Amino acid sequence: GTYALVWQGAGTVSVGGIGTLHDVVDEGDVHRGSVDLTQTPGEFGKLLTITITNEADQSVTGLHLYPPGVDPAASFYPPFLAALTPFRALRFMDWEATNGSTLVKWADRPTTARFGAQNGVPHELIAELINETGKDAWLTVPEKVDDDFIAQLAQSFAQELDFSRIQSARDAAGFTTPFRLYVENSNETWNGGFSAYATFLAAANAEPARYTGETRGTYGPDWMNGNADLMKV
């Protein structure tokens, strides 16, 4: 099919392999072209190649390749949204890369300008998916983040969530209950297979005076106190 290729900057972009770039239109610093992909059924190992050449004082940024029929202004791939239809709630543990997260400071969080697999998906995109689908959401706050991170996270969602859009999406989906946003302190802090267990156990041992009398495991006291701290922030 024919894909849309969009990029910014004065560098050079070329396409090879199973792709052919044509009909490039320059709109100032933004460049738009069409890429025809030709894949012969039964052939394997054939790849699309996109080569970027940056000269002095020239660079290419914001390169996007859109499948046929996809609106470049859309935040999410339509088949992805369609796959979410059966569900009433979305848990974002993996999107937030919660297990084993090393995030501490808000400045180190993934942003829409810079993100990959290591620290998860930007909170702005999580909020946008909630806005678009109207589904209840379950957030998991990484274990090591400081109070400022938690406060900034709350402010971010307060600003990014559009409750008018959420309600419209819920009405369209036939949801009759109010929207709910669940916030969990990390994930499975009782599970010794995750680093959060050691994090909370160390915190509990460091502050024995906060012990509440919980006897269901060494993780219990500070997990509860950690939840209380999280809710206060």
Regions found by a protein language model. Name each.
Residues 1-185, 190-233:
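Non-catalytic accessory regions flanking glycosidase/transglycosidase catalytic cores in CAZymes
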